[in-house]
């Protein structure tokens, strides 16, 4: 098992607010993603639980390079790039599979067409959609926890859907596909 906190501490200082936000949020996401994965394993679906936990702990590592003061991040890049930046950071450590999770967890994934239509600063435009079950379960679990409201606990299904609705029907369709795959978190 990777020592995820040591990896995080290459980029964040323990005790700082951004570290606290990242580690708290990532632990919430990891716990839910592991529980959902264990449920699938119980149904005979193979899942790499160790990888799910590691990648969930590292999925938002790129946020430190973004300008998102609401979650204690004072970098220079737009927040939408935190996944792409996280992938670059983890790729530089040889953690390519973990880096893919970073790049593909934003929203319910982002298509090249959405990048172009929304004029997102992701170049070159490409599909950044979760593909493996492990990528999808982390993306899905992430939708139930806010980095700006750490102490509120998991969002309800209704609140998770509402937070995604502003991104359009394709985003909600991908979310509904994840609900069908993983079930609802409140049923764990």
Q: How does the language model describe each region?
A:
Residues 7-11, 32, 85-86, 140, ...:
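A general alpha-helix detector
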Residues 32-35, 143, 177, 181:
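Alpha-helical scaffold segments in carbohydrate-active enzymes
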Residues 1-79:
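Acidic/His-rich, divalent-metal-binding segments that scaffold phosphate/diphosphate chemistry
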Residues 163-188:
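Charged phosphate-binding loop/patch that engages nucleotide di/tri-phosphates or the phosphate backbone
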Residues 45-157:
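Divalent metal-dependent catalytic cores for phosphoryl transfer on phosphate-bearing substrates
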Residues 16, 20-23, 131, 165-169:
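Charge-dense, low-complexity intrinsically disordered segments
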Residues 38, 146-149, 187:
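Charged/polar positions within long, soluble alpha-helices
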Residues 27, 31, 96, 180-183:
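Generic structural signal for well-ordered, non-transmembrane alpha-helical segments
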